[in-house]
C-alpha cells in the first residue's frame, strides 16, 4: 500500500459519503489527479510517463463485493490489471444517512515515490 494513495482514497471516500454523491469530480471541482497530487503522490513532476487512475464505487457491503463489481466493469478492470501501475491505495467510508451507505475508492499509480 502506498500511503499517499491511501490518504487520497480515504479522504475522497469520506467526502463522497459525507456529501452523499458519487462522481470522479468532487463537489469542490477536485479531480483524481489533483487529490492524489495534494496527498503527496507527486506523479505530475516525477517522470514524463507517470500516471494515475481512480476507481470509485458505492453500495457494496464488502471488499469482495466491490472488487467483483470493479472486475465486471471493463474500464475499472482495465485499471486494476494494468501492469504499469506499481502502487495502490484503498479507502472506504460509511454514512448510514447517505443513499449508498458505503463509498469505496481505489487509487492506482506509477512513476512517483510512495
Model-derived features: positions:
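Disulfide-stabilized extracellular recognition modules
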Residues: 49, 53, 57-114
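Short, surface-exposed glycine/acidic/tryptophan-bearing loops
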Residues: 3-60, 80-82
Amino acid at each position: 500500500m502506498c500511503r499517499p494513495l491511501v490518504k487520497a482514497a480515504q479522504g475522497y471516500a469520506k467526502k463522497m459519503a459525507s456529501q452523499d454523491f458519487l462522481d470522479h469530480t468532487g463537489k469542490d471541482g477536485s479531480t483524481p489527479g489533483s487529490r492524489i497530487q495534494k496527498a503527496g503522490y507527486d506523479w505530475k513532476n516525477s517522470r514524463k510517463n507517470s500516471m494515475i487512475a481512480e476507481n470509485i464505487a458505492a453500495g457494496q457491503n464488502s471488499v469482495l463485493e466491490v472488487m467483483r463489481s470493479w472486475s465486471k466493469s471493463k474500464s475499472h478492470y482495465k485499471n486494476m490489471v494494468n501492469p504499469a501501475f506499481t502502487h495502490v491505495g484503498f479507502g472506504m467510508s460509511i454514512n448510514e444517512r447517505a443513499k449508498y451507505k458505503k463509498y469505496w475508492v481505489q487509487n492506482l499509480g506509477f512513476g512517483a515515490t510512495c
